[in-house]
């Protein structure tokens, strides 16, 4: 009996030790291992923040995507098909957007939604609606040198003329019209009296001699000039 008890005791002690080691190892493994759910959540948050920051830093254009290495690609879906026309890889987003506008005008016409509608009349037109011709015209549009004034045309419209400027313009027009009218005589102070006196001089301009009486002659001298016939000089 004693031999059996002695042999059983070491086995029980060894089993207890093994149980203790397993429990401690499990506790250590649980403490050392980080939770998986927290890591996945952090990664999702980082990716969402990165995508939001990238969208805020770069402009968003229709039909344009940004590659991970910094280039911009443009493509457009063919009408009534599942395939897309690859327009190319470009350095800037504006170049890719202009390429997309050319393809959209060719495929959809006037109903196309453009990234730069103010440049529609300046874009090159492809020779046909084939994918190759569309790609060629898109590359030409992307290489265009566009002035900033054309892009800011719609953003900053011209200010309407002020009331003061319109009044000055109307006044200048009236002055030009008055210059075309025949110039009237200038009537100043005293000119009316001068005209009256001049008219009086013209109306009553008679020679001065008419107003001078002839010299008084002697009565007898005046009679002697005439030969009087004697009325009672008849001979009987």
Swiss-Prot record:
InterPro entries noted in UniProt: AP2/ERF_dom, AP2/ERF_dom_sf, AP2/ERF_TF_ERF_subfamily, DNA-bd_dom_sf
Subcellular location per the Swiss-Prot or TrEMBL entry: Nucleus
Induction behaviour: By UV LIGHT.
Coiled-coil blocks: none
Principal location: nucleus
Provenance organism: Arabidopsis thaliana
Keyword terms: Activator, DNA-binding, Ethylene signaling pathway, Nucleus, Transcription, Transcription regulation
Comp. bias (Low complexity): 1-27, 161-170
Gene: ERF036
Family indicated by similarity: Belongs to the AP2/ERF transcription factor family. ERF subfamily.
Gene Ontology MF, one: transcription cis-regulatory region binding
Function: Probably acts as a transcriptional activator. Binds to the GCC-box pathogenesis-related promoter element. May be involved in the regulation of gene expression by stress factors and by components of stress signal transduction pathways.
Record region (Disordered): 1-60, 152-174
Protein name: Ethylene-responsive transcription factor ERF036
DNA-binding region, residue intervals: 60-117
SUPFAM superfamilies associated with the record: DNA-binding domain
Any GO CC annotation of this UniProt entry: nucleus
Pfam families: AP2
GO biological process terms on file: ethylene-activated signaling pathway
């Amino acid at each position: 009996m004693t031999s059996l008890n002695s042999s059983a005791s070491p086995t029980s002690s060894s089993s207890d030790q093994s149980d203790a080691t397993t429990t401690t190892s499990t506790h250590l493994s649980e403490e050392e291992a980080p939770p998986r759910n927290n890591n996945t959540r952090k990664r999702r948050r980082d990716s969402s923040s990165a995508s939001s920051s990238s969208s805020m830093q770069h402009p968003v254009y229709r039909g344009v995507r940004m590659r991970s290495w910094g280039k911009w690609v443009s493509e457009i879906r063919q009408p009534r098909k599942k395939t897309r026309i690859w327009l190319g890889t470009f350095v800037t987003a504006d170049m890719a957007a202009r390429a997309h506008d050319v393809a959209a005008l060719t495929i959809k016409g006037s109903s196309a939604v453009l990234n730069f509608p103010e440049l529609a009349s300046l874009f090159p037109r492809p020779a046909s609606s084939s994918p190759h011709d569309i790609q060629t015209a898109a590359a030409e549009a992307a290489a265009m040198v566009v002035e900033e004034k054309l892009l800011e045309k719609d953003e900053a419209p011209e200010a309407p003329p002020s009331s003061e400027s319109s009044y000055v313009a109307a006044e200048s027009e009236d002055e030009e019209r008055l210059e075309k009218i025949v110039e009237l005589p200038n009537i100043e102070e005293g000119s009316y009296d001068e005209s009256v006196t001049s008219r009086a001089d013209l109306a009553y301009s008679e020679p001065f001699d008419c107003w001078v009486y002839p010299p008084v002659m002697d009565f007898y001298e005046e009679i002697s000039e005439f030969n009087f016939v004697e009325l009672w000089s008849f001979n009987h």
